């Protein structure tokens, strides 16, 4: 099953997440199909906190992909801001 989920990057104690489309059997930070955005939970000042390509997310959802709980909340937040 294809899932849209977070893949962790960044340094120790400084997380940065890529929003990726991946096979659910692959490791969290492993192989992915497509990168559709990013999430920076520690963004300060005028740094960008969240960017999602909503058109690509919707395309994958039409193909049968599922959203992780956290990504579903982030997509909802991005749609509200757009």
UniProtKB/Swiss-Prot annotation:
GO molecular function: structural constituent of ribosome
PROSITE patterns according to UniProt: RIBOSOMAL_S16
Domain of life of the source: Bacteria
Pfam families named among the record's database cross-references: Ribosomal_S16 (PF00886)
Stored InterPro entries: Ribosomal_bS16 (IPR000307), Ribosomal_bS16_CS (IPR020592), Ribosomal_bS16_dom_sf (IPR023803)
Gene Ontology CC terms, in alphabetical order: cytoplasm; small ribosomal subunit
Signal peptide: none
Keyword vocabulary terms for this entry: Ribonucleoprotein, Ribosomal protein
Any single GO BP term: translation
Assigned protein family: Belongs to the bacterial ribosomal protein bS16 family.
Record-linked HAMAP family: Ribosomal_bS16 (MF_00385)
PANTHER family (alphabetical): 30S RIBOSOMAL PROTEIN S16, SMALL RIBOSOMAL SUBUNIT PROTEIN BS16M
Name listed for the protein in its UniProt record: Small ribosomal subunit protein bS16
Species for this entry: Mannheimia succiniciproducens (strain KCTC 0769BP / MBEL55E)
């Amino acid at each position: 099953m294809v899932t849209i989920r977070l893949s962790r990057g960044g340094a120790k104690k400084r997380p940065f997440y890529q929003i990726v489309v991946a096979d659910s059997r692959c490791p969290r930070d492993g192989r992915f199909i497509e990168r559709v955005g990013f999430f920076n939970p520690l963004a300060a000042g005028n740094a960008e906190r969240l960017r999602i390509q909503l058109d690509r997310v919707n395309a994958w959802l039409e193909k049968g992909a599922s959203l992780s709980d956290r990504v579903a909340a982030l997509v909802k937040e991005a749609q509200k801001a757009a």
